[in-house]
């Protein structure tokens, strides 16, 4: 999880034009405590920078865990059914 976290920060801090980060979760089958904590940290730090954290293609049991923990409501961004939905919506709101 720390590798992903560091990569996100590196990319966001290197480009001040980034307004949204989307994590494609199609390969995620479960979320453990350390991954949950990492997502909370990333969400908070990105929000402090004015960058939204969004998730796409979240599987049912992972979505259940995010809802149960409250993280689904705490996200600075949204959870999208598909990556295409995320791209379309975020592009539309970025062009306003």
Where in the sequence are the language-model features?
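Structured cytosolic domains appended to multi-pass membrane proteins
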Residues: 1-96
């Amino acid at each position: 999880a720390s590798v992903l976290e560091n990569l996100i920060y590196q990319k966001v801090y290197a480009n001040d034009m980034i307004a949204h980060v989307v994590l494609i979760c199609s390969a995620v089958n479960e979320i453990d405590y350390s991954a949950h904590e990492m997502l909370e940290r990333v969400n908070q730090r990105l929000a402090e920078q004015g960058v939204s954290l969004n998730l796409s293609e979240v599987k049912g049991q992972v979505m259940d865990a995010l809802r149960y923990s409250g993280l689904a409501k705490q996200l600075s961004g949204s959870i999208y059914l598909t990556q295409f939905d995320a791209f379309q919506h975020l592009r539309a709101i970025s062009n306003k």
